[in-house]
UniProtKB/Swiss-Prot annotation:
Segments forming a coiled coil: none
InterPro entries for the chain: ASF1-like, ASF1-like_sf
Protein's UniProt keywords contain Zinc: no
Main location (coarse class): nucleus
Protein name, UniProt field: Histone chaperone asf1
Source taxon at top rank: Eukaryota
Record-level Gene Ontology MF annotations: histone binding
Amino acid sequence: MSHIRLTQVLIHNNPSSFNSPFIFDISFECVSPIKEDLEWKVIYVGSADNEKNDQVLDSILLGPVAVGQNQFVFEVDPPDANKIPKDDLLGVTVVFLICAYKGEDFIRVGYYVNNDYFEQELKDNPPETPDLSKIQRNVMDDKPVVTGFPIQWN
């Protein structure tokens, strides 16, 4: 049985410009005492074709964690567009919110992300070099994919 139960994740600042931070408002319940900190991280998938294009946007340790309801806001920088293949900058990708205990991932929340131009003219005729200031990021927060993994807690 998991000692931590994710109860809610709200994504603020959505939709937003590509260069805006991701802001996750995370609520979880600690149902049994844990001795170590929780590690939370956000990973942006830069290309479905190559895992080396994935970017860890940020990682934090949270603790000590009290038994009961807990909540915090996790704000992370946007991905570095220079590390994303030009052909993968627009369209659908994924961002993961992951929580680990003692180095073992026990929950992963995946969200589809659609990056597209604000303006119809740019959608119809995208520039040769992507203009990040005109790209909108829309996290599909109504349909997260939540995966739990069994781990050794203590």
